Design a protein with these regions (language model features):
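Bacterial Sec-dependent N-terminal signal peptides
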Residues: 1-23
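Sequence signature of WD/YWTD-type beta-propeller architectures
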Residues: 22-306
Length: 306
């Protein structure tokens, strides 16, 4: 199904119907071409899927109720991906650069590494196997994998403040990169390994920022009135996609909001609309979802009914 204006106008109307009461969620899993802005709906399903990643081999993975699923873009077949005991995952997950490993943010109350029902970061072989815990402190939410495959970037709450941290894929001591008041979240590496893009509330408004991989020289990138979240550099290093909440959500990124995907040209810093506004938010594009050739982005929109 190809669409543009009519579809988004329709699902935007659903936002007026959304409430905290439990309602049936329909997920629309899309890809959007960054050059033509053509949107293809890969799958429509009456279940709540979140946070697509695009594997180097060309399929998607998504989260549903804590478990991870693959979606074949050609056959539309959905299969559960075996992740061992890690079956209470949130929507912060993603592939290693070589596609052999999957990072998970798993809530395991029974694992000795966790002190409470909050996520630690694990990695698991993409073909299945037992997860290996990476972070010992909780909560820790994975967001990025360094291009050399050696380091993970994540958001973590320590002593009441959420900041950006990095850690070796072998575990060990974590390194704190941000030290300002307010939420710092969504870190993702540029493919040349020079920068980390992230979103921060340090200015009193949620914006996209960039810093060195050691946390040096933080620089604000967006300055508009939207609440901007989850920047993801493209594999060819030319673009950064992010999700914009079209109202001031302060330090929240909730489900059931009017949002829009935006695209930053890394050379000129020009920002353009990649989609029209639609009904989404949490789960739409939390994690890296670029196609391997940097021509498309995968995302999820929603419809909520009785």
């Amino acid at each position: 199904m190809n669409f543009k204006t009519s579809f988004f106008a329709l699902i935007l109307l659903c936002s007026a119907l959304f409430s905290s009461a439990q309602r049936k969620v329909t997920s629309f899993i899309h890809t959007v071409d960054i050059y033509t802005e053509q949107i293809d709906t890969v799958l429509k399903v009456d279940e709540h899927y979140e946070a697509p990643n695009w594997h180097p081999d060309g399929y998607l993975i998504l989260n549903k109720k804590g478990r991870i699923y693959t979606l074949d873009l050609k056959t539309k077949e959905v299969k559960e991906l075996p992740t061992g005991f890690a079956i209470e995952n949130n929507n912060d997950h993603g592939f290693s650069p070589d596609g052999r490993w999957l990072a998970l943010s798993h809530n395991d109350r029974n694992h000795p590494s966790t002190k409470s029902y909050k996520p630690s970061i694990y990695i698991v072989p993409i073909r299945g196997g037992e997860p290996r815990v990476i972070t010992k402190e909780v909560p820790s939410y994975w967001h990025g994998w360094s291009p050399d495959g050696q380091t993970l970037a994540y958001c973590a709450e320590r002593n009441g403040n959420f900041d950006v941290y990095t850690i070796s894929v072998n575990g060990g001591e974590e390194k704190r990169l941000t030290f300002t008041e307010g939420l710092d979240d969504g870190p993702d590496y540029t493919p040349d390994g020079k920068y980390i893009y992230f979103n921060s509330y340090r200015s009193g408004h949620m914006h996209i920022w960039r810093m060195g991989v050691d946390g040096s020289n933080p620089e604000q990138i967006t300055f508009d009135e939207n609440s901007n979240w989850f920047p993801h550099p493209s594999p060819d290093n030319n673009w950064v996609v992010y999700i914009a909440y079209l109202s001031d959500e302060k330090e929240d990124h909730l489900f059931g909001k009017t949002v829009q995907l935006k695209l930053i040209n890394r050379k000129t810093r020009e920002i353009k609309d990649l989609t029209q506004p639609f009904f989404g938010g949490q789960g739409t594009i939390n994690v890296p979802s670029w196609s391997p050739d940097s021509s498309k982005v995968a995302f999820v929109s929603y419809r909520v009914g009785e």
